[in-house]
Swiss-Prot record:
GO biological process, one term: carbohydrate metabolic process
GO CC field: cytoplasm
Keyword Transit peptide attributed: no
InterPro entries in alphabetical order: Aldolase_TIM, TAL/FSA, Transaldolase_3B, Transaldolase_3B/F6P_aldolase, Transaldolase_AS, TSA/FSA_arc/bac
Pathway noted in the entry: Carbohydrate degradation; pentose phosphate pathway; D-glyceraldehyde 3-phosphate and beta-D-fructose 6-phosphate from D-ribose 5-phosphate and D-xylulose 5-phosphate (non-oxidative stage): step 2/3
Catalytic activity: D-sedoheptulose 7-phosphate + D-glyceraldehyde 3-phosphate = D-erythrose 4-phosphate + beta-D-fructose 6-phosphate
Function recorded in the entry: Transaldolase is important for the balance of metabolites in the pentose-phosphate pathway.
Family as reported in the entry's similarity comment: Belongs to the transaldolase family. Type 3B subfamily.
Keyword terms of this UniProt record: Cytoplasm, Pentose shunt, Schiff base, Transferase
EC number, UniProt record: 2.2.1.2
GO molecular function, one term: transaldolase activity
Subcellular localization(s) per the UniProt record: Cytoplasm
Gene encoding the protein: tal
Protein name: Probable transaldolase
Amino acid sequence: MKIFLDTANLEEIKKGVEWGIVDGVTTNPTLISKEGAEFKQRVKEICDLVKGPVSAEVVSLDYEGMVREARELAQISEYVVIKIPMTPDGIKAVKTLSAEGIKTNVTLVFSPAQAILAAKAGATYVSPFVGRMDDLSNDGMRMLGEIVEIYNNYGFETEIIAASIRHPMHVVEAALMGVDIVTIPFAVLERLFKHPMTDLGIERFMEDWKKYLENLKK
C-alpha cells in the first residue's frame, strides 16, 4: 500500500520524505490557501520534494474550464495529477484528459456507483471520502470495501485512494481491504508510529543500558 500525505505544508512533506515512507501528496485550494502560498508555485515546490504523484485540484466546475486548468497545471511537472470533482462535466473532462495522457484523480466520491463512473472514464485515481461518509452514516469503510470488490471484479486499472482518513484504524482497515493508497494528514502519519508498548519497551531498554554502564564503572 502506498502512503500519500494530504497537506500543502512543506515542512510536513520534508519530514515524511526523510522518513522514506511517503509516496505522494494530495492537495486542494483550501490546504494551499491555509499556507498563504501561491497555488502553482506551491504545487511545483511539492513536486520537487516528493518526486511522486502530487494531486492538484481544478477550481472550475464546467467542462471547458476544468480541461483548460488541467492542461495548465499539467505543465508544472510530470508528477502533477489533476483532481477533478465527481460531476457529469468532471467525468467528461476526465475522459478527455485521460485520452491526452494527463493523469487524473476523481475526488469527492461517496458511493460505489460514482467510483464505477470514474473508472469507466479512465481516471488514474479515485478518491472515496471515508471520514466524511462516516459523519453521515458510519458506512465509510463499507463503501470503500465495495469499491475494492467491484474494481477487482472487473480489473479496473484506476487506483483507489482512501481519502478523508481520520485515524490509524482507518489506515489499517483500508490496508486489510487491499486499497492501493491512503492519503492522510501529517498528524495521522505521526500516530502510526505510536504504541504504548513500544514506548514502554524503549524506556526499559534505556534503563537496563544505564544500569549496565553504571556497573562497568564499579
